[in-house]
């Protein structure tokens, strides 16, 4: 039997740079495996020092989970309380660096920090930085050792959370307070109970056979998409360029859903087969990198709607869904600052007007990100996913050949027609960007600390869209983002069947299940963007007023000094 590792031992190992993750009662050291992880290293870094049982079970099949256990270095025989991972600002000390030799609670090492401190980012020397740490010190909204509760007044006064005097920060504090009011207590025992009920739910869904994929439904999807491509190419031959471009855009929109399913290994549940399907439809036919999407999306699923860590809501300078983004946050995903610069200060206050127009150009940005991922080798370079990079490089090149050369260059008679065909076909895909952002943009962006359970975070940060079953194909499974975030490997055509079980679970644990109609959901998103825009406008106006007052004060001060000097000179004369 493996030895029991104390909390202090585990903290010491993390301080030494080891990738320590808790799975059930096992302590895993993933140092040797992380470089082979198909989902990249960032997703694992966010689990260091935490009980990742629910996350690991949700994203991996039983065969993969069995492989994890070869990295077991010990076990725990006591209730585990999550530590704050280094990538999120957790601070750890080695045993020989501590003054005391008794039991050590790693969660109580942070000092309270005010918002002014948190904005003073300090670069960490490379030699002093753990592999999982960001280049700069990250100061979490909720410090280590703090379990958020409804009694925030004392926290505000002590600046445990943030200085409430600052307008935008006060707005964010109010959102945190709302979440603490509307969701179950973050007490460790309560969150563990919610997690245990979630595991029972997972068992029910598995027993109901909902992980079995219905391939007849996928045949219908391929026939529908193939028909759209066929109509597009037929109309192209007739020189009906505009309608051809619209059909092509709609086909791309539907194709994204197949790639999404394959990326989650929810079609055949075979890693290589699903990835080949996903890469083929995404890159060869759509010109997008599945590898880029997976690297991004895996992190999004683990730290959903966190302004500092989730790349899916980091859209500055165009959009801000949280006032925290007004303060030049350091993105731990992109490893760079997200500057709230002059351009962002012009755009964000009117973002609710620009939302749909900007989404019309979303696909062009995906091209850029896809090529960067492949050319810079940002995906796995070792293990069973290493060859994906070269497959996608060939695929993206082929897409540019068939679309931009064979269709745009060879089939279009003039540059004006070429431009119109490209723009119409790409704007037609705008609806998928609406569907993607609809699920999360209006939902909570609060950081509620490390005690929050996996199911509660997913329910708090995700929204479903209500639609009749016959229209499910249009949304491609994205209308069930709540259920999908709880069970990412569940085949999309079974999500609706799981809905009643999820609603029953939500009723039992007291967590709101958010669902709106498509139009109502869009209204909620626009309303939220408008609220954030108003906060940006207010903050910028305050800054402008303060600057003017400071200038006026300086002017009057200089004026009085000058007058005094003149009077003094006259006296001397």
From Swiss-Prot:
It is a multi-pass membrane protein. Residues 2-77 form the Cytochrome b5 heme-binding domain. Pathway: Lipid metabolism; sphingolipid metabolism. Its EC number is 1.14.19.18. Its main location: membrane. It is an enzyme of class 1 (oxidoreductase). The chain crosses the membrane at residues 228-248, 273-293, 353-372, 393-413, 422-442. A motif (Histidine box-3) lies at residues 481-485. Keywords: Electron transport, Heme, Iron, Lipid metabolism, Membrane, Metal-binding, Oxidoreductase, Sphingolipid metabolism, Transmembrane, Transmembrane helix, Transport. InterPro entries: Cyt_B5-like_heme/steroid-bd, Cyt_B5-like_heme/steroid_sf, FA_desaturase_dom, Fatty_acid_desaturase. It catalyses: an N-acylsphing-4-enine + 2 Fe(II)-[cytochrome b5] + O2 + 2 H(+) = a (4E,8E)-4-sphinga-4,8-dienine ceramide + 2 Fe(III)-[cytochrome b5] + 2 H2O. GO terms for cellular component: membrane. Belongs to the fatty acid desaturase type 1 family. The histidine box domains may contain the active site and/or be involved in metal ion binding. This is Delta 8-(E)-sphingolipid desaturase. It comes from Kluyveromyces lactis (Yeast). The lineage of its organism: Eukaryota, Fungi, Dikarya, Ascomycota, Saccharomycotina. The gene is SLD.
